[in-house]
């Protein structure tokens, strides 16, 4: 299927390059137009998701990558899913989270499973737990072999009691065959005796590389997660008019996701009111809302192990204060301009640098920064207000594979980037600039003569209560541009309209 056949929303509609009408009838028409577009998008990605998760196609891609470094590779890829593990000092199981490497080649989200993929024949064998009569009493019948074969993109399904005999048989099919597995992810009772060699490094690296470029099914999964999360973000804005605490809004987000069959969060949600928004990964989510200017919500659900990662900032009083609007406009400009520069092969470091340039221009216009823009950039003073990276890969993990970060970079502007270098077409990335007023971060800059000459402390004092503003979308990189997978509102007129209702 052509990718664009199920992604009808183009850059013009999703990057909000057209200013919506602002009043009465025209505004109503605009809102209905966006609703119709979103409905069309839902229908399209739902159609894609009716197919099986493409585990075998992923396995073939992984084999191709293995053979780039090992041209004569043959044998078996053996992967295990997450095994059931009890809570410490308890007889209940830990919350289940499937191993992503196993899921990538199977689409199977069951515990205690395994996969054997024969490289020569491209045959995929899924192993599922046998029926335990004692467990059936409590949990009901598990998935049968026939049901698993119908549900998953595999050639054969067996019980896990057949793992060792099957591996022995496959090993004997070709001399000097190799078993490719992941270190510390093989059960003690599994043996590789008949294989000529064992490789515990190559397949993990190959899967990490393969996961960077998403196929149409994976993009549809991320889009579905985004659709549900965007609905939940809107629900939080609506609920904020009557809520008294961050906790109530946290509950609203969870309720909306769970009610749409997405109970798993991609990460611990952040709901930070007022100055708490200056803490990048604020986790308390329990402070009162009264007297606070804004709420920053960074939250996203998973859909079948694929993440969304969305951040919005909105006024708690229905309308941004002057200072909050000042900062919001800068961050929105940072986000839009960086998004417009995205296309396959672009260098992420360049986008991050551009975001800092936009931030510096905006803060100079407000008088928070003073002096020459180039000198401020060269001194890295803008890192006092924008201390994190512009974004990261997104997929089965919120901070997905392939980012190539360098936490030891001597340049503080790039040290915290989770994504570096060229970004290929097909990747999904976040674009999440922000400006923050964190005393802990900014004070050392004010005490340092290298930076203090560029910061007007008197003007800065007007902005502490803003806390922080971050805006984050999930972007699918294409050969010549991008597709924005996030539909949550972010234009000031839209945000204030929903906040004020």
Curated annotation (Swiss-Prot):
Annotated catalysed reactions: Release of any N-terminal amino acid, including proline, that is linked to proline, even from a dipeptide or tripeptide
Annotated spans, Disordered: 1-25
Biased composition (Polar residues): 12-25
A GO term for molecular function: manganese ion binding
Binding positions (Mn(2+) 1): 309, 432, 472
Residues involved in Mn(2+) 2 binding: 298, 309, 472
Entry EC no(s): 3.4.11.9
Cofactor note: Binds 2 manganese ions per subunit.
Main EC class the enzyme belongs to: hydrolase
A Gene Ontology BP annotation from the UniProt entry: proteolysis
Alphabetic keyword roster: Aminopeptidase, Hydrolase, Manganese, Metal-binding, Metalloprotease, Protease
InterPro entries the record matches: Aminopep_P_N, Creatin/AminoP/Spt16_N, Creatinase/aminopeptidase-like, Pept_M24, X-Pro_dipept-like
Co-factor requirement: Mn(2+)
Superkingdom: Eukaryota
Function recorded in the entry: Catalyzes the removal of a penultimate prolyl residue from the N-termini of peptides.
PANTHER family recorded: XAA-PRO AMINOPEPTIDASE 3, XAA-PRO DIPEPTIDASE
Record family assignment: Belongs to the peptidase M24B family.
UniProt protein name: Probable Xaa-Pro aminopeptidase pepP
Species this protein is from: Metarhizium acridum (strain CQMa 102)
GN (gene name): pepP
């Amino acid at each position: 299927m052509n990718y664009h056949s199920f992604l009808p929303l183009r850059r013009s509609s999703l990057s909000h390059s057209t200013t919506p009408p602002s009043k009465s009838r025209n505004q109503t028409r605009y809102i209905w137009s966006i609703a119709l577009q979103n409905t069309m998008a839902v229908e399209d990605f739902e159609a894609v998701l009716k197919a099986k998760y493409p585990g075998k196609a992923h396995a073939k891609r992984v084999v191709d990558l293995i053979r780039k470094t090992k041209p004569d590779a043959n044998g078996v890829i053996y992967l295990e899913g997450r095994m059931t593990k009890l809570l410490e000092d308890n007889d209940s199981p830990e919350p289940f989270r499937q191993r992503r490497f196993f899921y990538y080649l199977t689409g199977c989200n069951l515990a205690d499973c395994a996969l054997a993929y024969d490289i020569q024949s491209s045959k995929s064998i899924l192993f599922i737990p046998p029926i335990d009569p004692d467990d059936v009493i409590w949990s009901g019948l598990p998935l049968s072999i026939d049901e698993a074969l119908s549900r998953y993109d595999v050639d054969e399904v067996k019980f896990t009691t057949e793992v060792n005999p099957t591996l022995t048989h496959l090993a004997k099919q070709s001399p000097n065959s190799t078993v490719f597995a992941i270190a510390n992810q093989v059960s003690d009772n599994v043996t590789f005796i008949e294989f000529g060699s064992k490789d515990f490094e190559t397949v993990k690296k190959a899967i990490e590389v393969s996961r960077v470029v998403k196929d149409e099914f994976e993009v549809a999964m991320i889009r579905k997660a985004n659709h549900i999360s965007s609905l939940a973000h809107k629900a939080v804005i609506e609920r904020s008019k009557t809520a008294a605490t961050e906790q109530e809004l946290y509950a609203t987000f969870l309720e909306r996701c769970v009610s749409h069959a997405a109970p798993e969060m991609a990460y611990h949600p952040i709901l930070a009111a007022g100055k708490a928004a200056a803490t990048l990964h604020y986790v308390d989510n329990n402070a009162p809302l009264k007297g606070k200017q804004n709420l920053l919500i960074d939250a996203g659900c998973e859909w079948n192990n694929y993440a969304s990662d969305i951040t919005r900032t909105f006024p708690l009083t229905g309308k941004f204060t002057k200072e909050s609007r000042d900062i919001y406009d800068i961050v929105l400009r940072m986000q839009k301009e960086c998004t417009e520069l995205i296309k396959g092969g672009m260098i992420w470091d360049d986008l991050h640098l551009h975001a800092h340039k936009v931030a510096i221009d905006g803060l100079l216009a407000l008088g928070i920064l003073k002096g020459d823009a180039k000198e401020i950039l060269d001194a890295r003073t803008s890192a006092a207000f924008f201390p994190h990276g512009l974004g990261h890969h997104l997929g089965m993990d919120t901070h997905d594979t392939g980012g190539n970060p360098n936490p030891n970079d001597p340049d503080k502007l790039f040290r915290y980037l989770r994504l570096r270098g060229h970004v290929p077409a097909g990747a999904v990335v976040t674009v999440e600039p922000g400006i923050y007023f964190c005393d802990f971060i900014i004070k050392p800059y004010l005490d340092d003569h290298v930076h203090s000459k560029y910061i007007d402390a008197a003007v800065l004092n007007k902005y502490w209560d803003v806390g922080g503003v971050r805006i984050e979308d999930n972007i699918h990189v294409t050969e010549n541009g991008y597709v924005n997978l996030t539909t949550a509102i972010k234009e000031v007129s839209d945000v204030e309209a929903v906040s004020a209702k």
